[in-house]
Regions:
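Predominantly a Rossmann-like dinucleotide-binding segment in NAD(P)-dependent oxidoreductases
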Residues: 1, 6-103, 223
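Ligand-binding pocket scaffold of soluble enzyme catalytic domains
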Residues: 12, 181-184
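C-terminal hydrophobic helical "lid"/dimerization subdomain
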Residues: 206-218
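Short, hydrophobic secondary-structure boundary micro-motifs
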Residues: 2-3, 27, 42, 171, ...
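Contiguous beta-strand/loop segments that form the cofactor/metal-binding neighborhood of enzyme cores
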Residues: 26, 65-155, 183-199, 213-216, ...
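Structured beta->alpha junctions
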Residues: 4-7, 34, 128-130, 205, ...
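Glycine- and charged-residue-rich phosphate/anionic-cofactor binding loop of Rossmann-like
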Residues: 3, 168-174, 192-209
Length: 257
């Protein structure tokens, strides 16, 4: 399986359940947002501001994969990016590059518009030049309700459902793997090979997400709409109800069989 595999966790699988059961009606739009401070992280993780990295490639996979696993492939993307505070000085005492000047090589702020094959329209906002406290948002707006998801970098972030004239309610998890379950994609792949079926964390979906981020950066550079060339088959949801560690409850891993 290909990372990230957090979409197989309790949070995103429950969100997928809500959408596929029609609890928000027909999905119309979606919105993903994350803000961090790589000015702090970058002082001891310098790869974050090098070419091939940045917040887009560091965190974008979690958000785009979560949406892809629910909404399917994209048709096109367009974007704007910027490098906020390009010239920096390392202020972390004890760091190998302490007091050295350095330059950000990649955008640390990006805003993208996305069109899915299904017709759903979405936006992606990523900013790594904000306060240290991380802010995340992942939402799908439907004709009959709104799905509010937690941090897709976690397996068990809370999921909320909002209906007309009502406050958002915490939706109970329908699936297992609520705790940190890194490696879940590889485990699901192993069970899939044993069963002779396609695994869910596929290279096709991962490549599509990879192309999406490249397309976003390319669109920002050339000012043109990026038409997606890759596609993938929407992965089936894991069977619901396998929540627990065995004993008097179902064991989570049985959902992978």
């Amino acid at each position: 399986g290909v990372a990230p595999d957090t979409f197989l966790g309790a949070s995103v699988q429950t969100a997928k359940y809500i959408v596929e059961k029609g609890l928000i009606g027909r999905p119309v739009t979606c919105r993903a947002s994350v803000s961090r401070n790589y000015g702090v992280y970058g002082e001891f993780l310098p790869h974050l501001y090098k070419k091939g990295a940045g917040i887009g490639f560091d965190m974008g996979g979690y958000y785009l994969t979560a949406l892809a696993s629910i909404l399917g492939p994209l048709k096109s993307v367009s974007a704007y990016t910027t490098i906020s505070g390009k010239q920096r000085v390392n202020t972390r005492v004890g760091a190998p590059m302490f007091e050295q000047h350095y330059e950000l090589e990649v955008p640390n702020v990006l805003v993208a518009a996305m069109q899915y094959d299904s017709g759903v329209l979405g936006t992606l906002h990523m900013n790594s030049d904000s306060i240290l406290d991380e802010r995340t948002s992942l939402e799908i707006y439907g004709t009959d309700g709104i799905l509010l998801m937690g941090d897709p970098n976690q397996f068990g972030a809370p999921v909320y459902l909002q209906k007309t004239n009502a406050q958002p309610i915490a939706f109970p998890f329908t699936h297992g793997f609520e705790q940190n379950s890194r490696g879940l994609g590889a485990a699901e792949m192993a069970w899939s090979i044993r069963a002779g079926r396609n695994h869910r964390a596929s290279k096709e979906m991962a490549f599509h997400v990879f192309e999406t981020m490249h397309g976003i950066l390319q669109s920002a550079e050339n000012g043109k709409l990026h038409m997606m060339e890759s596609t993938f088959t929407l992965p089936a949801a894991l069977p619901e109800g396998y929540i627990g560690d065995g004993g008097w409850t179902r064991i989570e891993e049985s959902a992978l069989i």
